[in-house]
Amino acid sequence: MEKTSLKLIFLFSLTVIAFCSSLGDAREMVKAEVNCIGGKCPEGKKNCNCMPPIAHVMDDIRPCNTDGDCYKFCPRECELGTCYCRCDYGCTCTC
């Protein structure tokens, strides 16, 4: 009986330790994301694991023949030269 209780206590302690260590990792990750400015690491900071900017997508069902026909439908949020369009059953553009 005592051996079983000791085993259970040991397993419970390991579970608590594993859970607490995973919380520490999550806190470090949040700190890293807070340090990002505009999706980039600020000056002097390295490896801040910035999240990529959200991709803007524009779908248009107007007929097209080539990908080049679709560039006029680039989302307004795209910076010059960052828009990629394709023609599949209508235009789909993203940046």
Swiss-Prot record:
Principal subcellular localization: secreted
Species in which this protein is naturally found: Arabidopsis thaliana
Signal peptide positions (record): 1-26
Disulfide bonds: C48-C95, C64-C83, C70-C91, C74-C93
Protein name per Swiss-Prot or TrEMBL: Putative defensin-like protein 262
A cellular-component GO term for this protein: extracellular region
Biological processes annotated in GO: defense response to fungus; killing of cells of another organism
Alphabetical keyword list: Antimicrobial, Disulfide bond, Fungicide, Plant defense, Secreted, Signal
Entry annotated with the keyword Secreted: yes
Transmembrane intervals: none
Compartments it resides in: Secreted
Annotated family: Belongs to the DEFL family.
